[in-house]
From Swiss-Prot:
It comes from Bacillus cereus (strain ATCC 10987 / NRS 248). NCBIfam families: rnpA. HAMAP family: RNase_P (MF_00227). One of its GO terms (biological process) is tRNA 5'-leader removal. It catalyses: Endonucleolytic cleavage of RNA, removing 5'-extranucleotides from tRNA precursor. One of its GO terms (cellular component) is ribonuclease P complex. Keywords: Endonuclease, Hydrolase, Nuclease, RNA-binding, tRNA processing. This is Ribonuclease P protein component. The gene is rnpA. GO terms for molecular function: 3'-tRNA processing endoribonuclease activity; ribonuclease P activity; tRNA binding. Consists of a catalytic RNA component (M1 or rnpB) and a protein subunit. PROSITE patterns: RIBONUCLEASE_P (PS00648). It is an enzyme of class 3 (hydrolase). Belongs to the RnpA family.
Amino acid sequence: MKKKHRIKKNDEFQTVFQKGKSNANRQFVVYQLDKEEQPNFRIGLSVSKKIGNAVVRNRIKRMIRQSITELKDEIDSGKDFVIIARKPCAEMTYEELKKSLIHVFKRSGMKRIKK
């Protein structure tokens, strides 16, 4: 993901947590905050140590980033998203993870995602 599509600072994460709306399924929690002044979307990832060791956590983050890269044309611009991975992600294949991510994005009200 390009730098303009990332959330890195703690205070930006906290703003999305406090002011944003959340949607969830068994694998993910997605917080979403509208920012009309922003020309593109931004994504922040959070994978807890409870999920597994560093290898597992980094694998999950890589798969989420790859899914976002493939879906970037369908994700609404002008929004910040924080994606929190839950325990079941550790055993999922890439296809299952992407399908679950699409499902939770659709639940959050994104109409453009069709896959």
